[in-house]
């Protein structure tokens, strides 16, 4: 079998490292800093900006435990996948992306993730898949409880909040209010 030739370095330069592509690139670094501030506002400790932490998911004394750590990984991986998609688009089209475009795409993906998780609150496999209840001999437990959802996405009401229905209202109950915007991870005014 033939071996593919090694990738050629760009004219007059070196091959780009993953560390540069995802942590140091001027188009990505502002989004990293945005996510660090968002995570801090959500009550987390800002992790070190190192390749093992951001690219491999390594944890240390800074890391939260349990559900909060899972939330951190969801945020981190969503940022990395969004940056990767924009880099692939740049490679295909030659169109360079800007930091604000990366942040906007990240916010959109996170909003979709939060909304999808909200759809799972109180729902069971039967509710979401169209499966027959008889396929589940025991009562299927919900994917998410309200408490689990609030613990992940409603900490300090930065990303989302759940509002009870107004008094006397009829309908399905609690309402999801998405609060996540590009300003959610922006530096404080005057900083």
Regions found by a protein language model. Give the residues of each.
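Family-specific functional microsites
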Residues: 1-191
């Amino acid at each position: 079998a033939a071996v593919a030739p090694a990738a050629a370095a760009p004219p007059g330069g070196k091959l780009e490292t993953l560390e540069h592509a995802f942590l140091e690139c001027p188009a990505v670094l502002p989004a990293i800093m945005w996510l660090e501030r968002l995570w801090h506002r959500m009550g987390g400790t800002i992790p070190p900006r190192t390749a093992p932490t951001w690219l491999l998911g390594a944890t240390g004394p800074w890391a939260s435990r349990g559900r909060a750590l899972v939330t951190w990984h969801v945020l981190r991986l969503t940022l990395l996948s969004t940056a990767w998609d924009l880099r692939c688009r740049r490679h295909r089209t030659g169109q360079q992306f800007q930091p604000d475009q990366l942040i906007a795409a990240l916010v959109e993906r996170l909003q979709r993730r939060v909304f999808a998780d909200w759809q799972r609150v109180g729902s069971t496999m039967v509710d979401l898949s169209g499966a027959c209840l008889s396929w589940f001999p025991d009562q299927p437990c919900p994917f998410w409880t309200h408490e689990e959802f609030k613990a992940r996405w409603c900490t300090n009401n930065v990303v989302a909040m759940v509002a009870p229905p107004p008094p006397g209202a009829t309908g399905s109950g609690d309402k999801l209010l998405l609060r996540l915007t590009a300003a959610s991870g922006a530096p404080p005014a005057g900083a």
